[in-house]
Amino acid sequence: MIKTILVVCIGNICRSPMAQALLRQSLPGVSVISAGIGALSGYPADPSAVEVMAHHGIDISEHRAQQLTGSLVSRADLILVMDGAQKQEIQSRHPAKTGSVFRLGEMEQFDIADPYRKQLTAFEEALEMIQRGVDAWVPRIRALG
């Protein structure tokens, strides 16, 4: 049973907050948290991320970035990352969690590019890829629950 999902990206201000919000919306009985490997701790979500999510009726303006910690990793039943490098880094730092770390795009074999400091269209493209990943994971998570 998956009770806690940890979503990870680099700064925890763009991709992981968007994925966290979409997963929370789709899985109301599951605790979904997010963090960054090199988080801009305490920073709000990127204004462009807030904007694209608002266009989809989801408010992430209250999000504050947090650093990935061993405690967060150990609490998570499932850890979803944005790319293969993040997956490898978490697996090397936390070998006991190797079987719990997957890319959000694992099912369709894709990574989600970082839109940080790019045009709004990059955020829209990232959100589209995140949604594809969420759509692939949600039925599997529900089936385990």
Curated annotation (Swiss-Prot):
Record-linked CDD domains: LMWPTP
Functional pathway: Glycan metabolism; exopolysaccharide biosynthesis
GO biological process: lipopolysaccharide biosynthetic process
GO molecular-function terms, A-Z: protein tyrosine phosphatase activity
Keyword Hydrolase in record: yes
Catalytic residues (UniProt): C9 (nucleophile), R15, D114 (proton donor)
Keyword Hydrolase among UniProt keywords: yes
Reactions performed catalytically: O-phospho-L-tyrosyl-[protein] + H2O = L-tyrosyl-[protein] + phosphate
Keywords linked to the UniProt accession: Hydrolase, Lipopolysaccharide biosynthesis, Plasmid, Protein phosphatase
A Pfam entry, by short name: LMWPc
Gene3D superfamilies: 3.40.50.2300
Name this protein carries in UniProt: Probable low molecular weight protein-tyrosine-phosphatase EpsP
Lineage per the UniProt record: Bacteria, Pseudomonadati, Pseudomonadota, Betaproteobacteria, Burkholderiales
Gene: epsP
